[in-house]
Amino acid sequence: MEAMAASTSLPDPGDFDRNVPRICGVCGDRATGFHFNAMTCEGCKGFFRRSMKRKALFTCPFNGDCRITKDNRRHCQACRLKRCVDIGMMKEFILTDEEVQRKREMILKRKEEEALKDSLRPKLSEEQQRIIAILLDAHHKTYDPTYSDFCQFRPPVRVNDGGGSHPSRPNSRHTPSFSGDSSSCCSDHYITSPDMMDSSSFSNLDLSEEDSDDPSLTLELSQLSMLPHLADLVSYSIQKVIGFAKMIPGFRDLTSEDQIVLLKSSAIEVIMLRSNESFTMDDMSWTCGNPDYKYRISDVTKAGHNLELIEPLIKFQVGLKKLNLHEEEHVLLMAICIVSPDRPGVQDAALIEAIQDRLSNTLQTYIRCRHPPPGSHLLYAKMIQKLADLRSLNEEHSKQYRCLSFQPESSMKLTPLVLEVFGNEIS
């Protein structure tokens, strides 16, 4: 039995290397595969099967030791059959006519099952494909992977341990236009374009008033060296989020009031989602092209935030990165995040929910159709959990932001758009 097991074992994978020519072990002709436990050509395979089925007895007309080749293999059937047995061909591997028929039926059945399975497999509808195409285009128009606009921000200033500071470039440049300076060269397209939401729309909502006299909330100015630069970065990102949101299918069908509510409440969450593209797990930083724009945890603390926000933010970024989302999934997740019917203050929750359901169904179908396992396993549920994590991060960001915005020294470093979006808390 051990000998039988050995003879029926699969050949070494190296034997199937397509770059290595397959040679028939009987006659030396080109082999077509393993037949009856040996590598042979089609001719010797058929010869062995016929001989075994007929129980043929051959006699060598010579000395019983003929050399079998492709050219003379028909001259001596006895030595050819002997050679078949010598290289390991076994009659036990030959199927009966009934077994051959059953095998054919099984192959046919398997093909039919595969065809049925394929027909039942979910497919993206034309409408869903259109939604994905629109969102991809929206993202490409509002996210610059070269980060070339970062040079227009107020420069990053990183305070040394000894108290000194080193701006990455001369500090003479004024705050760019996205912080409210209309004379700057930076475009305000996503705020002031007739097709887009005007940033002044946000100013209809009053700033929240909270008591900031608690000395534990006071931040020394020396701790805020990165605040001007990161405030400009966030202001710039808010504009891009507005531009992306305006291109979400169905978003323009909402009232301007609901659009404002959704954008104000989701802006920081979408910014966190967007930033995952530049996040690297090698050193837990956000790398945005130029080394001056490589942001570490210490940079975020120098903008007034503490580990109560930073630690869960890093955990979120790592978890999201490990999901290895396709770009299609990434843009759908951002859209779903923005169009959330449970945001406080929305008026037409039913319409918002209908838009979000359409996006969610598209995401689920895309995962089933296009994201291969094992990555697709529970992927949708994991992505929805990320949205829940963002709500917690949003809440903590709001708490820490208030500490900044209600201190005149620090709020002066913020931009008007940041003050309007994050200062008018809807809670």
From Swiss-Prot:
Keyword Cytoplasm attached: yes
Renumbered ranges of motif 9aaTAD: 416-424
Post-translational modification: Ubiquitinated by UBR5, leading to its degradation: UBR5 specifically recognizes and binds ligand-bound VDR when it is not associated with coactivators (NCOAs). In presence of NCOAs, the UBR5-degron is not accessible, preventing its ubiquitination and degradation.
DNA-binding region: 21-96
Keywords recorded for this protein, A-Z: Cytoplasm, DNA-binding, Metal-binding, Nucleus, Receptor, Transcription, Transcription regulation, Ubl conjugation, Zinc, Zinc-finger
Region of interest (Disordered), residue spans: 158-183
Binding site for calcitriol: 143, 237, 274, 278, 305, 397
Annotated region described as Hinge, given as residue ranges: 97-126
Domain NR LBD as annotated: residue spans: 127-423
SMART domains per record: HOLI, ZnF_C4
Keyword Methyltransferase set for record: no
Annotated stretches, region: Interaction with coactivator LXXLL motif: 246-264
CDD domains with a match to the protein in the record: NR_DBD_VDR, NR_LBD_VDR
Binding positions (Zn(2+) 1): 24, 27, 41, 44
Signal peptide positions on this chain: none
Role noted for this protein: Nuclear receptor for calcitriol, the active form of vitamin D3 which mediates the action of this vitamin on cells. Enters the nucleus upon vitamin D3 binding where it forms heterodimers with the retinoid X receptor/RXR. The VDR-RXR heterodimers bind to specific response elements on DNA and activate the transcription of vitamin D3-responsive target genes. Plays a central role in calcium homeostasis.
Annotated family: Belongs to the nuclear hormone receptor family. NR1 subfamily.
Domain notes: Composed of three domains: a modulating N-terminal domain, a DNA-binding domain and a C-terminal ligand-binding domain. The 9aaTAD motif is a transactivation domain present in a large number of yeast and animal transcription factors.
Protein name: Vitamin D3 receptor
Organism of this sequence: Saguinus oedipus (Cotton-top tamarin)
Gene giving rise to this polypeptide: VDR
